UniProtKB/Swiss-Prot annotation:
GO terms for molecular function: amino acid binding; ornithine carbamoyltransferase activity. It comes from the Archaea. GO terms for cellular component: cytoplasm. Its EC number is 2.1.3.3. It comes from Hyperthermus butylicus (strain DSM 5456 / JCM 9403 / PLM1-5). Pathway: Amino-acid biosynthesis; L-arginine biosynthesis; L-arginine from L-ornithine and carbamoyl phosphate: step 1/3. This is Ornithine carbamoyltransferase. Keywords: Amino-acid biosynthesis, Arginine biosynthesis, Cytoplasm, Transferase. Reversibly catalyzes the transfer of the carbamoyl group from carbamoyl phosphate (CP) to the N(epsilon) atom of ornithine (ORN) to produce L-citrulline. GO terms for biological process: arginine biosynthetic process via ornithine; citrulline biosynthetic process; L-arginine biosynthetic process. It catalyses: carbamoyl phosphate + L-ornithine = L-citrulline + phosphate + H(+).
Length: 314
């Protein structure tokens, strides 16, 4: 009997209930155990084909999604936007309908979240968000897996995101921790707080799970006693024209040894990568004893295998 995610789109963490987030985490844990037991290929998706569309460059997402598909027995077909007729003006709705006749799922990394929504509206196969300007759900699911592995639980864990609080990673992290009953703090300048609709969705989830949400402008105050300190780049892809303004606003939000010293004694540091050493994080922190970024990056593979299996395996 198909599970609760079978055949569904995944555009946002908002698409998942708390129980479904836990299902992804537990499935990912089992996938990872089997991987390290030597079961590298689990042919649950044998005969399936997955189209991967990239409007933005990618290292972790592209490689981990291709490998995830291959390890599940599926065939990934990877396209840059300029390799498709999208680049010559074909409407997204036409591309979505055509690809649906050839493949079993479409995953896309796009500049505008609206592109994903249009794709999902017209595709007759599941559509998966590999990153948009609004959210990065696959990253957040891998992050939740990482925190669970490192801390043994998530309920009540204090997770502090420091930096640009309205970027895609911050949005998805806020939502996933709220759905899992954690204590999520977003520390950012008032100009860069989370989008109102995302914050309201997180607050609604928190009412059900007992999670707590805080917006704290002062990073030192925010990080005090943190179990997890998380940051991301100050200038997201597509926002390069705002670089000077972002650096001015975020200068005091750098995660350095002084800031980490305010966190709990066993705090961990997380970053979705790529990192700009000397900007949002120092070399000493990302290469230091707090850092779990390489385990976090690996967990993209296991979390995405779980997502693909749950959506595509009947």
């Amino acid at each position: 009997m198909p599970g609760p995610l079978y055949g569904r789109d995944l555009l946002s963490i908002r698409d998942l209930s708390s129980e479904e987030v836990w299902l992804v985490i537990e499935t990912a844990r089992q996938m990872k155990l089997r991987y390290y037991a030597g079961e590298r290929i689990i042919p649950m998706l044998k005969g399936k084909t997955i189209a991967l569309i990239f409007e933005k460059p990618s290292t972790r997402t592209r490689v981990s999604m291709e490998v995830a598909a291959l390890q599940l027995g599926a065939t990934p077909l990877t396209f840059r936007r300029d390799e498709l007729q999208l680049a010559r003006g074909e409407p997204i709705k036409d591309t979505a309908r055509v690809l649906s006749r050839y493949v079993d799922a479409i995953a896309a990394r796009v500049f505008k979240h609206e592109s994903l929504e249009e794709m999902a509206a017209y595709a007759s196969v599941p559509v998966i968000n590999m990153l948009s300007d609004l959210e990065h759900p696959l990253q957040a699911l891998a992050d939740a897996l990482t925190i669970y592995e490192k801390k043994g639980h998530i309920k009540g864990i204090k997770v502090v995101y420091v930096g640009d609080g309205r970027n895609n990673v911050a949005h998805s992290l806020l939502l996933v921790i709220a759905k899992l009953g954690g204590h999520i703090v977003i520390s950012s300048p008032k100009e860069l707080t989370p989008r109102k609709d995302i914050l309201e969705a997180a607050q609604l989830a928190a009412k059900e799970t007992g999670a707590t949400i805080e917006l704290i402008e002062d990073p030192a105050e925010a990080v005090r006693g943190a179990d997890v300190v998380y940051t991301d780049v100050w200038v997201s892809m597509g926002e390069e024209s705002l670089a000077e303004e972002r650096r001015r606003l975020l200068q005091r939000y750098q995660v350095n040894e002084k800031l980490m010293s305010l966190a709990s004694n066993n705090a961990i540091f997380m970053h979705c990568l790529p990192a700009h050493r000397g900007e949002e994080v120092t070399e000493e922190v990302i290469e230091g004893p707090w850092s779990v970024v390489w385990d976090q990056a690996e967990n993209r593979l296991h979390a995405q295998k779980a997502v693909l299996a749950l959506i595509l395996a009947p």
